[in-house]
A protein has these predicted regions:
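Peptidyl-prolyl cis-trans isomerase
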Residues: 2-247
């Protein structure tokens, strides 16, 4: 392999790739480029992507474009492949995973709902109960109690956390929040070494809008790519790639 004036033997490159733990990432890129070739964007679509890229990076001048490519050791075809890959992967994911996406969304919806909640945690059960009574009776605001007494990082935000997907929370915590109504304050409960006070501020049900659709398609694509790389690393023969071109 030669990069400008630097020449490296191919066997040395192989060793470097292994020692740098780059075998899996390189295999993943190989699979992505195989998918790109399988999808086969037409020249008009690639031209549009290239023009948009050149305008965004102020590379419409040929001299600037050539210098940009030379700096990276790329050819013009390398750039077109680089620009084609995200769109090709997007189309591949849509065709492969799109038909079952609604069912997949419904299966995961409980973890995709986002929640805004207030949390106060202490180690002393007596203090937890005393604070719960004071907050419940309006003697002290939750925010003030959390800022003063909470032993976790939520003290800096006066107890307020989120919004975040329920699936990112500790399962016990997420389960408790699922069963609260907005504004409900739970009595002190123990989770691990902590006694918690929880109040649900807002629960936002996930919707299968375009942003959610693209997120789920990307997640499924990543899972598929990683599984294919694992099979290649294990010496297995992966399934043949298929993509049906639109008429």
């Amino acid at each position: 392999m030669q990069f400008r004036s630097w020449i490296v033997d191919s066997t040395e490159i192989e060793g470097l790739i292994r020692r740098a733990d780059q075998v899996a990432p390189l295999l993943k890129r190989c699979v992505e480029e195989q998918v790109t070739a399988c999808v086969g964007l037409d020249a008009e679509a690639i031209d549009a992507l290239e023009q948009q890229f050149l305008e965004q990076h102020k590379l419409e001048d040929e001299k600037a474009r050539v210098a940009w490519l030379e700096q990276r050791g790329w050819s013009a075809d390398d750039l077109r492949l680089h620009l084609s890959r995200p769109e090709a992967l997007k189309r591949f994911a849509e065709q492969r995973f799109g038909p079952g996406l609604e069912e997949h969304f419904l299966q995961r919806k409980g973890n995709l709902d986002t929640v805004l909640y207030s949390l106060l945690r202490v180690r002393d059960p007596g203090l937890a109960r005393e604070l719960w009574i004071q907050i419940s009776e309006g003697e002290v605001r939750f925010e003030d109690a959390a800022a003063r007494h909470s032993d976790g990082p939520e003290a800096r935000s006066r107890g307020l956390l989120g919004p975040m997907p329920l699936g990112q929370l500790q399962p016990e915590l997420a389960e408790r929040l699922r069963h609260l109504q907005q504004g409900d304050l739970r009595p002190p409960e123990r989770i691990g070494p902590w006694w918690l006070l929880l109040r649900l501020e807002q629960l936002n049900p996930a919707r299968l809008d375009d942003a959610m659709r693209q997120r789920l398609l990307q997640e499924q694509l990543e899972t598929w790519l990683n599984a294919r790389v694992e099979s290649l690393l294990a010496g297995e023969q992966p399934e043949e790639l298929h993509y049906h071109q639109s008429p």
